[in-house]
Amino acid sequence: MALLLLGAPLRAQDVPDEAHEARVNAIEMAHAFTDESFIVRDGFWRTRLAPNEEVVCALQLFAGVDYWICLGSGTPEAQLQMGLFTSAPRPVAVLERVQEPSRAAIKVRPRTSGLFYLKVRNNHGQAARVCVTYCYK
């Protein structure tokens, strides 16, 4: 029975696409922090980045709360970079940073509540689908 399943041909809907892989990588990165009592936010943002393109998305964050902002890509060779900025725009201090193939995360603790801007850049020579989510405590 197992041999029949392993030898079964894949249908188009069985093959995960790049957008799905980006979301899976972002969610897996966020879930890595649940052991530290972080709660994964039920929501995400995703887009496609051209080579050397950067995009900005807005996040509502609150003072004194710890956040892990997690980024995933469906492109294994992706070279992603991210930073968080206030509306001033001033960079928010990054407490910790994790960088892995296809995913990354930054830990921040904003001093004030408000709208913050996450800048994501694709430093790779190929387009990449990316997905962002975050967890907090």
Question: Could you say what each language-model-derived stretch is?
Answer:
Residues 13-17, 43-129, 135-137:
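Acidic, Ser/Thr/Pro-rich low-complexity intrinsically disordered segments
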Residues 13-38:
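Predominantly extracellular/luminal regions of secreted and cell-surface proteins
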